[in-house]
Amino acid sequence: MLINMSQPLSLGIESLAEWATVQTSYDDPQGFLELYNNCCPQGLEASQCHITQTKPNIAGKVIASDYFIKNDKAVEIKEILENINKKPFFMEVKSKSGVYEKDVSPLIYRIKADADGIYLLSAFGNTNLRCDRFTEKLNQAFNLDIKLRDVTRLNQYVDQNGELKEVGEYIKGLL
C-alpha cells in the first residue's frame, strides 16, 4: 500500500481539509475507511473514501487553500486587509540563496475581514504563500497578535479549466 498525503501545513495550524491518495488492491471503500481509521494515529482519521478511475495526484494539483484566521482586532483594519492584494505587499522570504523581500500580493487571491477574523484564499502548492509567515507579517505590520493555533485551513482547491474547484468536487469527477 502506498499513501500520498497532501502538502503539510506548519505545526500548530488546524485543518479541516486534508486529502490523501492511497494505492491499494482493497476494493471496498467503506471497509477500507473503517480499517484505516482503526489503525491510523489520532487526528489523522479519514471521513471519506472513494475509488477513482485515474490517479488523482492531489498533492501535485492543489494550487490554493482557504483559511480562517481567528482575530477580533482584524475588523479594525478591515479596509486595509481587503485591499492588501491590490498593491505590492512585501514579505521577507528565506531561501537557500539567502533572505530577500518578495511581493506576495499576487499570491493573495481573496481576503476578507469581519468581527471574527480574517478569511484568506491564497496560493498553496508549488507556488505557495505560507500562512504561518503571512500571519507573522500581519502581526508585525498591524500588531494583531495572531498565533498559529488561531489559523484553520477550511478547504483546498485545484485548477480545472482556469477555475478553482474544491478538491472534493474534483475527486467526485474522477469516480
Label every model-predicted segment:
Residues 1-23, 52-57:
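Short, charge-patterned binding micro-sites
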Residues 2-6, 86-175:
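Core RNA-modification/binding signature centered on pseudouridine synthases
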Residues 12, 57-61, 110-113:
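Short, conserved, surface-exposed binding loops centered on an aromatic residue
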Residues 16-20, 63-65, 89:
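A generic structural signal for short beta-strands and their flanking turns/coil linkers
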Residues 16-18, 28, 32:
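Generic hydrophobic, aliphatic-rich segments that mediate packing or membrane embedding
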Residues 21-28, 69-74, 120-126:
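Short beta-strand-to-loop capping motifs
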Residues 30-40, 77-86, 134-138:
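Short amphipathic alpha-helices in soluble, non-transmembrane regions
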Residues 36-76:
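Hydrophobic, well-structured mid-protein blocks that either form specific transmembrane helices
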